[in-house]
């Protein structure tokens, strides 16, 4: 250690000041004070003392950036050479205490908050002191009066003068000494009673306009034990001030009881004097400080999304709680050691650990953490009670997978830079950077870290005497921020205390944070080179509970080993109930189990006659019919895999599916052949035409056995690259789902299931085969009937349906058409395909109180569904539940580590249900299907792309998607596939597709297009509509096209979807085409369409589906039209006549058919049409505007 150089007075004085603050005899001039244990509070005090001792200006940043006496002296000499006349800060001038003074910048937001939420205890400071022995209440009362007399701020009130807040010092303030005697209570009850009184004291409001500003209450716990409760509004105090009060109370009490005069040093200024000086000082530096902060915080996210137990309310109520935890001495010692090694403060290391925890909890890598700083940048304020504390917003950068040591170094730099500019009041920063604020959360900062190392908390009590601080004086029942971590030193390490928003977080969740922080810090300090992303958050037992106990689903399901293929499972039931009705159609036709299997066996043998090998792909393009079910079952019995195709899809898409899958045979109906493409190499079999082989067909040979690992079906889903991708599902996983359903939902007497899901969606698999494996009857909805909620309601009643599946958006439309009659047969409703909202769930229970509602989840890549939850009314959320039999679910971070309960992560699916992979896409299969590190050897898991979280009870909650995949009216689609299709047109320079709309029935696809050439917007929209109609299925076609000059980007260069304009601000769904509506019916319908579609004007030639309509809106539209015209209109009418003029004529025709009095209206409607319009009326059904369910 080099002794201070006596010939360098500046260096010597700086070294002496630091030695005093560090409680050392001396320090070397080249010593890094932060390696010697200096804290940020010490740096502020050192700056104030050096300014005064050397009579020189000294920016706080210089102290942080020049951490040795020699380096700081060199910087001071350099600044003097460039500004030789500069001198230190002037003393604060006393002001007239009888006049009103302005508030300080720190007080202004507190005063405003009190005005906005009077009685809210958020900004109340409350702490407790313990006392042992005899307490002289008279002496204590005298001490309190002395303190109030000494510190004018405790005699200050805050009136409004000319509509502006002000502070006014009173000559005197009476502070009554409250008492609560608990000695009469049993000793075991006293702590509870004391806590109740402390909470009441902490939560009682203050009247800032009249005072008093201090409450003191003594709790008598025994004859020799007392607790002193002190409560003040934050507008007059801070943590530093609290220690001053404790120190002075101790000094005064000791002096008065000893009969000697108190020796407290006189105060050079009072708080209201400082208020005037603060504004004058800031006036000269504010612009420079604002410039720095504006640049430093550019692009910072406005909200830190901590995992919460409840959704954030529209208006923050600041209700809260507090919870203590310990940071062990072994962790504290290593934390302080790392700080010294890195030449930084323990606060910087603790903040790095806290930022790492927040990063792991939220997935965000750009974090803003608030830190309270003392704000006492002048020595004359060190002994003054008052609100000086300021909040500094520290930006923590966790991007790029840093090690913990790298994160500490990053944090040290930003702490130094930010603390060096702490003079700017936080609320001025808020006014500048967040002028428009949400009432739901605090601006800029929602999380705070407060290392409470005020001068009297550096390992010492705040003044020797009879009163000692207790760890927590009482819960105010409020919280300033979403989450605050207070940390103080303790005899066994550090003591942490969480203050949390109880509207967001359960106490149990917050209780998990302390152990998680300690576990993370312990590992990080043991291996500082370890990436933050790999640091553990949980003890092994907690981790094992999630990946093992909550996935303990191994089970032997009904049917035994002979039920591991669909043909075996279904044939066994046919043998048990051969004469039971298996299928029933809309017109009452029926097939028994015997008839169904005879037909399927005959077709299976016909397929085998084409030389098909096991797992050959056979395409099935059929509307709902007997032939459709027979075809599917026959393909399976032949040992082949079926490829379902929507016969209404564009021919180009169908051709791609046939070509990509290598389908050898296409099974269809004659009426579909005109819409099918030429399929080279594919044999087309029309099922409703005679078999050319006639009586020559083999009817006796045995059909092949099917292994569980054999391919059952190939279903194509939307692909992000612009190409659909085929998912390969085997018999074993599918049978696992069917057999689990047989046990979970056993059929009762007369079980009847409505089959309404198109076969190219995998829900149809269990809809059909669960029914046919249990002996129940499958009622086939008419083709396109699944889009018509009124029709479906009728079928449920007429057929006595007991079980039905809905995607949530269609369930909402179904509930809109009215209740089922008394005595209806419906027992169970199944939901999947979209998130089920609590509101929709409760609507169903209100309408159908005795019906079971089951929420299921699963992608096509995991055999239909892998989780299940039976819903109950009134719960705050609708979970997706727990894994079904033999399924495993993991919620993992980007490193494939399990995340703690409550923390969002990506949902990975394992166990028996996992599909084989993607057909012909080995690269994508390797990317999405990985070895399962938590399952049995050789098992795999599937990356779903869904965000989820575990509840603490082992139940899963779905949180949405992390990529461009969306679910729209139950249809899974990749926005990238739509974008790629549209971007392929030469006139498109850039395109973004997004989902817009509020409720589930209003959501629609909108394409935002930047044209390659300006001035051709309308022509381009028409061209893109035609392109989408030719290449995309109806459910993937955008309803609206909005042209943009440029696509908005985030600061990181990604598409900013939140900044995309509402369709109404760009292009309303195209409308107003052709002549204006001319007949009364057209005008009535045009108004209905315009209201539903948000269109400005609707023309007579507008197509409902081209101007923004979809199947659910069609259901609402026909419902309104039915009411308006007094006639029941099926939803199919909108698909058959999607043009307004045609639809209007169809409506009045329907009226005429049901009401003879409407005949005249029909004639009037026809007469109102011009001859040319009559000639233009279609002879056949209008264009197909079909959409998915």
From Swiss-Prot:
<feature type="compositionally biased region" description="Basic and acidic residues">
    <location>
        <begin position="455"/>
        <end position="472"/>
    </location>
</feature>
<dbReference type="InterPro" id="IPR020845">
    <property type="entry name" value="AMP-binding_CS"/>
</dbReference>
<feature type="region of interest" description="Condensation">
    <location>
        <begin position="100"/>
        <end position="541"/>
    </location>
</feature>
<dbReference type="InterPro" id="IPR045851">
    <property type="entry name" value="AMP-bd_C_sf"/>
</dbReference>
<feature type="region of interest" description="Disordered">
    <location>
        <begin position="75"/>
        <end position="97"/>
    </location>
</feature>
<keyword id="KW-0436">Ligase</keyword>
<dbReference type="Pfam" id="PF13193">
    <property type="entry name" value="AMP-binding_C"/>
</dbReference>
<dbReference type="InterPro" id="IPR006162">
    <property type="entry name" value="Ppantetheine_attach_site"/>
</dbReference>
<feature type="domain" description="Carrier 1">
    <location>
        <begin position="5"/>
        <end position="80"/>
    </location>
</feature>
<keyword id="KW-0597">Phosphoprotein</keyword>
<keyword id="KW-0677">Repeat</keyword>
<feature type="domain" description="Carrier 2">
    <location>
        <begin position="1076"/>
        <end position="1151"/>
    </location>
</feature>
<dbReference type="InterPro" id="IPR009081">
    <property type="entry name" value="PP-bd_ACP"/>
</dbReference>
<dbReference type="InterPro" id="IPR001242">
    <property type="entry name" value="Condensatn"/>
</dbReference>
<dbReference type="Pfam" id="PF00550">
    <property type="entry name" value="PP-binding"/>
</dbReference>
<dbReference type="GO" id="GO:0043041">
    <property type="term" value="P:amino acid activation for nonribosomal peptide biosynthetic process"/>
</dbReference>
<dbReference type="InterPro" id="IPR036736">
    <property type="entry name" value="ACP-like_sf"/>
</dbReference>
<dbReference type="GO" id="GO:0044550">
    <property type="term" value="P:secondary metabolite biosynthetic process"/>
</dbReference>
<comment type="similarity">
    <text>Belongs to the NRP synthetase family.</text>
</comment>
<dbReference type="GO" id="GO:0017000">
    <property type="term" value="P:antibiotic biosynthetic process"/>
</dbReference>
<feature type="region of interest" description="Adenylation">
    <location>
        <begin position="572"/>
        <end position="969"/>
    </location>
</feature>
<feature type="region of interest" description="Disordered">
    <location>
        <begin position="454"/>
        <end position="476"/>
    </location>
</feature>
<dbReference type="GO" id="GO:0005829">
    <property type="term" value="C:cytosol"/>
</dbReference>
<feature type="modified residue" description="O-(pantetheine 4'-phosphoryl)serine">
    <location>
        <position position="1111"/>
    </location>
</feature>
<dbReference type="GO" id="GO:0031177">
    <property type="term" value="F:phosphopantetheine binding"/>
</dbReference>
<dbReference type="InterPro" id="IPR010071">
    <property type="entry name" value="AA_adenyl_dom"/>
</dbReference>
<dbReference type="Pfam" id="PF00668">
    <property type="entry name" value="Condensation"/>
</dbReference>
<dbReference type="InterPro" id="IPR020806">
    <property type="entry name" value="PKS_PP-bd"/>
</dbReference>
<comment type="pathway">
    <text>Secondary metabolite biosynthesis; bialaphos biosynthesis.</text>
</comment>
<protein>
    <recommendedName>
        <fullName>Phosphinothricin tripeptide synthetase PhsB</fullName>
        <ecNumber>6.2.1.67</ecNumber>
    </recommendedName>
</protein>
<feature type="modified residue" description="O-(pantetheine 4'-phosphoryl)serine">
    <location>
        <position position="40"/>
    </location>
</feature>
<dbReference type="GO" id="GO:0016874">
    <property type="term" value="F:ligase activity"/>
</dbReference>
<dbReference type="InterPro" id="IPR023213">
    <property type="entry name" value="CAT-like_dom_sf"/>
</dbReference>
<dbReference type="InterPro" id="IPR025110">
    <property type="entry name" value="AMP-bd_C"/>
</dbReference>
<keyword id="KW-0045">Antibiotic biosynthesis</keyword>
<dbReference type="GO" id="GO:0008610">
    <property type="term" value="P:lipid biosynthetic process"/>
</dbReference>
<comment type="function">
    <text>Involved in the biosynthesis of phosphinothricin tripeptide (PTT), also known as bialaphos (BA), a natural-product antibiotic and potent herbicide. Adenylates L-alanine and loads it onto a peptidyl carrier domain via a thioester linkage to the phosphopanthetheine moiety. Shows weaker activity with aminobutyric acid and L-serine.</text>
</comment>
<dbReference type="Pfam" id="PF00501">
    <property type="entry name" value="AMP-binding"/>
</dbReference>
<keyword id="KW-0596">Phosphopantetheine</keyword>
<feature type="region of interest" description="Disordered">
    <location>
        <begin position="1045"/>
        <end position="1081"/>
    </location>
</feature>
<dbReference type="InterPro" id="IPR000873">
    <property type="entry name" value="AMP-dep_synth/lig_dom"/>
</dbReference>
């Amino acid at each position: 250690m080099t002794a201070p150089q006596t010939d360098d007075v500046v260096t010597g004085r700086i070294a002496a000041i630091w030695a005093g603050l560090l409680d050392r005899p001396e320090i070397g001039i080249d010593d890094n004070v932060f390696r010697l244990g200096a804290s940020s509070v010490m740096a502020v005090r050192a700056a104030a003392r050096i300014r005064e001792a050397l009579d020189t200006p000294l920016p706080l940043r210089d102290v942080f950036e020049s951490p040795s006496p020699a380096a700081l002296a060199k910087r001071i000499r350099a600044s003097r050479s460039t500004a030789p006349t500069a001198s230190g800060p002037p003393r604060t001038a006393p002001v007239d205490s009888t006049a009103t003074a302005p508030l300080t910048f720190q007080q202004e937001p507190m005063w405003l908050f009190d005005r906005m939420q009077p009685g809210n205890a958020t900004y109340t400071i409350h702490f407790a002191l313990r006392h042992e022995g005899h307490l002289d209440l008279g002496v204590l009362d005298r001490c309190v009066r002395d303190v109030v007399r000494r510190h004018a701020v405790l005699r200050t009130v805050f009136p409004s003068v000319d509509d502006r807040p002000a502070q006014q010092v009173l000559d005197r303030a009476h502070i009554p000494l409250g008492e609560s005697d608990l000695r009469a209570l049993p000793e075991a009850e006293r702590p509870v009673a004391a806590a109740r009184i402390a909470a009441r004291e902490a939560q009682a409001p203050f009247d800032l306009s009249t005072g008093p500003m201090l409450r003191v209450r003594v709790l008598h716990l025994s004859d020799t034990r007392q607790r002193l409760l002190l409560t003040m509004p934050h507008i007059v105090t801070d943590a530093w001030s609290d220690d001053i009060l404790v120190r002075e109370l101790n000094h005064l009490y000791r002096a008065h009881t000893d009969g000697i005069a108190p020796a407290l040093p006189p105060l050079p200024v009072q708080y209201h004097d400082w208020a005037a000086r603060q504004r004058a000082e800031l006036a000269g530096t504010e612009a420079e400080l604002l410039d720095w902060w504006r640049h430093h915080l550019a692009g910072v996210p406005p909200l830190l999304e901590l995992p919460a137990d409840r959704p954030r309310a529209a208006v923050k109520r600041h209700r809260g709680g507090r919870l203590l935890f310990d940071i062990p001495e072994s962790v504290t010692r290593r934390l302080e050691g790392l700080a010294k090694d890195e030449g930084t403060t323990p606060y910087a290391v603790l903040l790095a650990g806290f930022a790492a925890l927040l990063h792991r909890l939220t997935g965000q890598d750009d974090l803003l953490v608030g830190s309270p700083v003392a704000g006492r940048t002048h020595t004359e304020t060190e002994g003054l009670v008052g609100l000086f504390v300021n909040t500094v917003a520290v930006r923590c950068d966790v991007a790029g997978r840093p090690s913990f040591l790298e994160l500490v170094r990053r944090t040290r730099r930003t702490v130094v830079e930010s603390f060096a500019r702490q003079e700017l009041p936080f609320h001025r920063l808020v006014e500048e950077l967040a002028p428009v604020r949400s009432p739901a959360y605090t601006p800029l900062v929602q999380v705070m870290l407060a290392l409470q190392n005020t001068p009297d908390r550096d390992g010492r009590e705040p003044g020797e005497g009879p009163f000692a601080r207790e760890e927590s004086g009482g819960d105010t029942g409020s919280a300033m921020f979403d989450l605050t971590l207070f940390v103080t030193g303790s005899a066994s390490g550090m003591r942490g205390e969480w203050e949390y928003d109880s509207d967001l977080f359960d106490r149990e969740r917050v209780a998990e944070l302390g152990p998680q922080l300690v576990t993370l810090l312990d590992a990080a300090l043991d291996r500082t080179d370890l990436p933050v992303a790999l640091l553990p958050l949980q003890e092994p037992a907690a981790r094992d509970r999630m990946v093992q106990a909550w996935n303990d689903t191994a089970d032997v399901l009904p049917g035994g080993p002979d039920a591991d293929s669909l043909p075996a499972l279904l044939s066994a039931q046919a043998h048990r109930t051969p004469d039971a009705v298996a299928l029933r159609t809309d017109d009452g036709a029926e097939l028994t189990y015997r008839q169904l299997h005879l037909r399927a066996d005959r077709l299976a043998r016909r397929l085998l006659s084409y030389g098909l090998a096991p797992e050959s792909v056979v395409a099935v393009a059929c509307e709902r019919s007997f032939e459709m079910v027979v075809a599917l079952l026959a393909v399976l019995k032949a040992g082949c895999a079926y490829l379902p195709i929507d016969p209404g899809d564009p021919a180009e898409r169908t051709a791609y599916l046939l070509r990509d899958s290598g389908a050898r045979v296409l099974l269809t109906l004659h009426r579909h052949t005109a819409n099918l493409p030429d399929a080279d190499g594919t044999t087309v079999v029309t099922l409703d035409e005679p078999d050319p082989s006639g009586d020559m067909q083999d009817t006796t040979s045995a059909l092949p056995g099917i292994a569980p690992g054999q391919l059952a079906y190939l279903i194509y889903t939307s692909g992000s690259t612009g190409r659909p991708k085929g998912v390969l599902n085997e018999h074993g996983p599918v049978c696992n789902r069917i057999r689990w359903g047989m046990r979970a939902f056993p059929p009762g007497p007369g079980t009847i299931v409505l089959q309404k899901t198109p076969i190219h969606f995998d829900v149809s698999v269990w809809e059909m085969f669960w029914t046919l494996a249990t002996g129940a009857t499958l009622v086939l909805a008419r083709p396109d009937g699944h889009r018509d909620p009124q029709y479906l309601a009728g079928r449920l009643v007429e057929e006595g349906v007991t079980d039905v599946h809905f995607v949530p958006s269609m369930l909402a439309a179904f509930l809109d058409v009215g209740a089922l009659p008394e005595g209806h047969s419906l027992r169970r409703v199944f939901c999947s395909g979209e998130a089920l909202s609590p509101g929709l769930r409760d609507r169903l229970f209100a309408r159908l109180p005795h019906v079971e509602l089951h929420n299921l989840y699963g992608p096509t890549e995991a055999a239909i569904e892998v989780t299940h939850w039976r819903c109950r009314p009134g719960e705050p959320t609708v979970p997706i539940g727990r894994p079904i039999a033999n399924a495993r679910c993991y919620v993992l971070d980007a490193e494939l580590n399990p995340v703690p309960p409550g923390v969002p992560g990506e949902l990975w699916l394992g166990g028996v249900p996992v599909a084989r992979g993607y057909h012909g896409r080995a690269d994508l299969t390797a990317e999405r299907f990985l070895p399962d590190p938590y399952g049995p050897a050789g098992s795999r898991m599937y990356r779903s792309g869904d965000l989820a979280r575990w509840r603490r009870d082992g139940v899963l909650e779905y949180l949405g998607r992390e990529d461009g995949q969306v679910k729209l009216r139950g249809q899974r689609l990749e926005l990238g596939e739509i974008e790629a299709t549209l971007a392929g047109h030469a006139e498109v320079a850039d395109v973004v597709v997004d989902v817009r709309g509020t409720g589930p029935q209003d959501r629609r696809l909108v394409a935002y297009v930047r044209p390659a050439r300006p001035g051709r917007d309308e022509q381009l929209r028409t061209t893109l509509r035609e392109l989408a109609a030719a290449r995309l299925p109806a459910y993937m076609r955008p309803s609206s096209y909005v042209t943009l000059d440029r696509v908005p980007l985030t600061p990181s260069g990604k598409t900013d979807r939140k900044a995309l304009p509402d369709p109404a601000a760009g292009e309303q769904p195209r409308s107003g085409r052709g002549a204006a509506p001319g007949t009364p019916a057209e005008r009535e319908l045009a108004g209905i369409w315009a209201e539903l579609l948000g269109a400005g004007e609707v023309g007579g030639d507008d197509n409902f589906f081209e101007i923004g309509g979809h199947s659910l809106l069609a259901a609402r539209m026909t419902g309104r039209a039915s009411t308006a015209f007094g006639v029941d209109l099926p939803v199919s009418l909108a698909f058959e006549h999607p043009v307004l003029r045609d639809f209007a004529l169809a409506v009045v025709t329907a009226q005429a058919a049901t009401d003879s009095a409407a005949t005249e209206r029909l004639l009037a409607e026809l007469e109102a049409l011009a001859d040319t319009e009559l000639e233009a009326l279609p002879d056949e059904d209008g264009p197909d505007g079909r959409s998915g369910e």
